[in-house]
Amino acid sequence: MGFMKHNIVDNVAFSNKLRHVNPKLKVIFALSLLLISVFSTSFIVPLIIFFINSILLLFKAKVPKKIYAVFVGIPLGFGILNLVIFAFLFGTVEWFKINVFGFEIPVYKDGIELGLLLFGRMLGGVSSMLFLAFTTPMVELFYIFRELKMPDVLVDMMMLIYRYIFVLYEEYEKMKFAQESRLGTSNLKSTYKSLGALAAHLFIRAWEKGEKLNITMMSRCYDGKIKLLQTIENPSIKYILFIAIFDIFLIILAYLTKDFTLTSYIKI
């Protein structure tokens, strides 16, 4: 399999319909919604943020629905599990009981409310980060990091690590395919042996690629800083004001709904 096949996020980031929207504007939008989601005292606002991000990604950016479902599905599953655990194990105010094989298991109101809050925060935060990841290529984010005066060494390390995650993954798949074609995983004993050999060879391959990269960069007059040729203009003030007004609206809504409890409206 090729390198680009593994890097699904970058493929989508370069081909989505919001690709040419100012990346600084997308960073401001995504990070502001992330902060509102994380610090919201109401589960309603983070869920609204989740639906807004989902609509923008699926219908405006045209992110493939299957890809988005995969990336949202995993945290969604953990969120539902977390909600169930909080409903049964945390809380003091009993709402109702469930009879399971003669045992009555209580469900707590305050446990459900806390679980809903964490569930909403998780969905709002994850969708905000996915919006940024699916609409903005990493190279543009690295440039923005530079403009934010992050240390050059840190930005360079992030770029190299991001690149070589996928390079080493491709090496891993080649080695794994070679082992499987030679029946290296035919039983448990050979699987453990093959796994150890794969880890050792992958470490050696990573070391070799690091040495080659260092030689290549030094031969091209590397002076301790990777040059980024791209420049990004500052976004229009009117769009920033629009995002600010929208954020203020969400903050006010979060304040107005902070005492809202779902269980008080459902009678069992």
Curated annotation (Swiss-Prot):
Coiled coil: none annotated. Keywords: Cell membrane, Membrane, Transmembrane, Transmembrane helix. PANTHER family: COBALT TRANSPORT PROTEIN CBIQ. Belongs to the CbiQ family. One of its GO terms (biological process) is cobalt ion transport. The chain crosses the membrane at residues 32-52, 70-90, 125-145, 237-257. It comes from Methanocaldococcus jannaschii (strain ATCC 43067 / DSM 2661 / JAL-1 / JCM 10045 / NBRC 100440) (Methanococcus jannaschii). This is Uncharacterized protein MJ1089. GO terms for cellular component: ATP-binding cassette (ABC) transporter complex. It is found in: Cell membrane. It comes from the Archaea. InterPro entries: ABC/ECF_trnsptr_transmembrane (IPR003339), Cobalt_transport_CbiQ (IPR052770), ECF_CbiQ (IPR012809). It is a multi-pass membrane protein.
